[in-house]
Regions:
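Iron-associated oxidoreductase/ferritin-like identity signal
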Residues: 1-175
């Protein structure tokens, strides 16, 4: 069983993951409403990944005999100034999530909970990828501009992104 401190922290992280999913669904809808199905697809994949993250944490809590508390999800933004701003906000959000994950890792380490530390290490690695993806999209938009043919081309590229489910149980590897 996890300590009360870790139980509370992981329950907060579960809420943050669901909020992230809701944010990305909102971003996907924003892109769809602007005729950008590729950008919408990219954020829909993000939405699904965040749902997986929440469920991975939930299943871990259950496997440890702890109680999962599903808190209300606060409202998310629904409008952005531009596609570039959309991805800039995506990066800012991922940086916040990285900070939350680091705090959770530090707590697990301070409590010498090596199993939780191992689980959270997977999320540390995931956040490196999440921030890199956001930065790559921002760099592309700054290079090509977020309108016209450049945006059309990027939208086509982002349409090719495919959702690959992660293992949401914690037996075996954390992949």
């Amino acid at each position: 069983m996890l300590s009360k401190n870790l139980e509370t922290a992981i329950n907060k992280q579960i809420n943050a993951e669901f909020w992230s999913a809701y944010l990305y669904l909102s971003m996907s809808t924003y892109a769809s409403n602007r005729g950008l199905p590729g950008v919408a697809n990219w954020f829909e994949v993000q939405f699904k990944e965040e749902m997986d993250h929440a469920i991975k944490f939930m299943n871990y809590m259950i496997s440890k005999g702890n109680k999962v508390n599903l808190f209300p999800i606060d409202a998310v933004p629904t409008t952005w100034d531009s596609v570039l701003n959309l991805f800039e906000e995506n990066l800012k959000h991922e940086q916040v999530v990285t900070s939350l994950i680091y705090d959770l890792f530090a707590l697990a380490r301070s409590e010498k909970d090596f199993a939780t530390e191992s689980l959270v290490q997977w999320f540390v690695n995931e956040q490196v990828e999440e921030e890199e993806n956001a930065l790559n999209n921002i760099d592309a938009l700054k290079l090509i501009g977020d309108n016209g043919f450049g945006l059309y081309s990027l939208d086509k590229e982002l349409a090719a992104r495919v959702y690959v489910p992660i293992a949401t149980t914690n037996s075996g590897s954390n992949a």
